[in-house]
Amino acid sequence: MKMGKKCLFCYNELNSEEDFHSACSLKFFGTNVAPKLNYTIDEMEELAQNIVESSIAVPGVQPKLSLGFINDVLQNGNKGRLTVVGALGGNYILKPQNKTFPEMPENEHLTMKMAEIFGISTVPSSLIRLKSGELSYITKRIDRKENGEKIHMQDMFQITEAFDKYRSSLEKIAKAISEYSSNTLLDILRFYEVILFSYITGNNDMHLKNFSLIRNNED
């Protein structure tokens, strides 16, 4: 029995040769047809290296690239492509394949889908295919509005005024949430759920820069 092709956003079967259902593409990218990512894995590695050396990469241990959406017309008549921009620009963050740790994008997106199933609020994310066929992990930036305007967000490394993002505790983060959150009880509950889920899924990367408070329109 032949396995059907799956949507890279929702994992349900596809009836076309595209990588996304139209509804899934509209939900994540804002277009009925998903934009193209016209880079090979070798080009991605070279871009990542150049950006890291230029000190304009998105912070983090795992290589990340900031992507902007360009609404132009492609050769096949479809509109839209994603292009690499500086760390301060773009509405998406891309994590390409890592030769040292194979299939990290697939693992991260699967974990995010599991979190959704458990009712945990997550940043919108998907897999996306490179021109050379490899899958990368892509997520929306939640510190940017659709028009590119910045949304104020601070991570716990900044909030707790720490000197080392790895030298702290979950208790210290919880106390900071209690002090600075405008919805303390709900945010503490969310934090507790994330801790339990991270323990179950083996996520041991819960350092201070992976927890943030974001200002919403009501604050």
Where do the PLM segments sit?
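Generic detector of bulky aromatic hydrophobic side chains
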Residues: K27, V33-P35, Q49, G77, ...
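Short hydrophobic/aromatic-rich motifs at helix boundaries and adjacent loops
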Residues: P35-Y39, R81-G86, S182-N183
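Short coil/turn linker and secondary-structure boundary residues
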Residues: Y39, I151, K165-S168, N183-L186
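Broad hydrophobic/π-residue packing in well-ordered secondary structure
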Residues: L26-F28, E53, G86-A87, Y92, ...
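Conserved ATP-binding subdomain of kinase catalytic cores across diverse folds
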Residues: E43-D164
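Conserved kinase catalytic-core segment
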Residues: K99-E116, S169-D219
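Regulatory N- and C-terminal appendages and interdomain linkers associated
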Residues: M1-E45, E179
